[in-house]
């Protein structure tokens, strides 16, 4: 309850940029529990998305299409903004053949609970039908030290998230670090180069390594 009250109070006056390296959905669940969805953005939007998943409940004989949110990098007008720099358990990469038989990624989608991420439909413009393309069989997130550093330059989502991170650091009035062990060299460099002359730095439960790196 304390964190929920804190977010609700601070968001009335300030923008809260939350950058996390975790893949779980804990923060999203917190936002839902605290009823803060109207003031929250994770960069994904359903508006204008041509992608659909299928929700099916065999027990109640229910089956219908569900529009999927895609990453648009739009955080405008929301006070609580979530940037998952390493991806998430509910992110998936949509790929399709364009001018060749080689599949090319064209969208990062967010899959709600209950939707089969292996069956993704895409609206065909001007037609009342959908295209079905081979789809990733695993969530879209980064893992492994070397892999993460290489993927940060990918233009589909990772590069944009990293640029957001740097820009937010440059604009920050206060930085709060919780539970970060300083194992990501790219993140460390971004903090050192872009934090600037922030007048107030707050550390909550930092490890010794975190304190030695940034204090």
Regions found by a protein language model. Give the residues of each.
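Extended, H/D-rich, highly charged conserved domains that either
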Residues: 9-143
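A general marker of short, structured functional hotspots
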Residues: 2, 126, 136-137, 176, ...
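A short acidic-Thr-Gly-centered motif at the start of a beta-strand
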Residues: 2-13, 72-75, 163-170
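A generic structural signal for ordered alpha-helices
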Residues: 4-5, 63, 139, 143, ...
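SIR2/sirtuin-family catalytic core signature
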Residues: 120, 145-215
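A Trp-anchored, charged/polar loop motif used as the substrate-binding/catalytic surface
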Residues: 1-2, 58-70, 150-164
């Amino acid at each position: 309850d304390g964190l929920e009250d804190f977010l609700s109070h601070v968001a009335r006056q300030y923008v809260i940029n939350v950058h996390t390296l975790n893949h779980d959905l804990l923060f999203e669940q917190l936002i839902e529990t605290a009823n803060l969805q109207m003031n929250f953005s994770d960069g994904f939007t359903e508006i204008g998305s041509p992608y659909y998943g299928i929700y099916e409940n065999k027990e109640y004989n229910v089956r219908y299409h569900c529009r999927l949110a895609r990453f648009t990098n739009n955080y405008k007008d929301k006070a609580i903004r979530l940037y998952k720099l390493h991806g998430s358990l509910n992110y998936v990469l949509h790929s399709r053949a364009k001018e060749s038989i080689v599949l090319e990624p064209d969208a990062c989608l967010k899959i709600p609970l209950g939707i089969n991420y292996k069956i993704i439909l895409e609206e065909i413009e001007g037609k009342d039908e959908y295209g079905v393309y081979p789809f990733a069989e695993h969530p879209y997130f980064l893992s492994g030290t070397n892999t993460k550093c290489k993927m940060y330059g990918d233009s589909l989502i990772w590069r944009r998230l990293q640029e957001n991170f740097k820009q937010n650091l440059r604009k920050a009035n206060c930085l709060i670090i919780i539970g970060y062990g300083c194992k990501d060299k790219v993140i460390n460099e971004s903090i050192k180069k872009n934090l600037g002359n922030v007048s107030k730095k707050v550390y909550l439960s930092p490890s010794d390594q975190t304190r030695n790196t940034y204090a």
